[in-house]
């Protein structure tokens, strides 16, 4: 699935990946566990019903990038306890993915994680996938000074901290809105989408933007996509 005249990967030397629902498939519903814990946390923190907490959670997620950011801005919440509680989930649905590890290894250059989650959660996911040795570093929500994607400041902090040249980088994401700023900075952008009927697990707004001008490439097969990139780069010498 390609748009007309997408940016290529010929110049890419840094490969930047989102974590959840990008490195592992959405149908594992790992984020569903986090989602439920966020809802429960909001209900307890604000002393409201689970239904009201759910509506507030989704509203804040869409408006602020994360529910946490909304709680901080609207209610003055301190994030430390929240971050610890909502990421206490069962990572066992994730199985080792040697094909993903091999595909990442073939890509020439650095590989970095840019996530709105915590480093602890990212480490757990990467170890379950058996790809933790493929990544140089994780830039998490704490490194972002608690300001989530798609905030432009978060990308600026990430690029500065890791010395990434955006015009020589590619960004892989499962949310199109999180690719708009990277594209504007000069990065080649890839939207990773669920395959087949599993797309129904997504919220409608999350599925928007597949045809947006800031999305260079769309794939529902990350491993195959990376293998094709690596093969093309190898053939080009």
Can you describe what each PLM-predicted range is?
Residues 1-12, 105, 112, 118-119, ...:
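Asp-based, Mg2+/Mn2+-dependent phosphohydrolase catalytic module
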Residues 2-17, 22-101, 120:
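N-terminal helical cap/lid subdomain that shapes the substrate entry/recognition surface
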Residues 29, 58-59, 94, 113, ...:
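Residue-level marker of alpha-helix boundaries and capping positions
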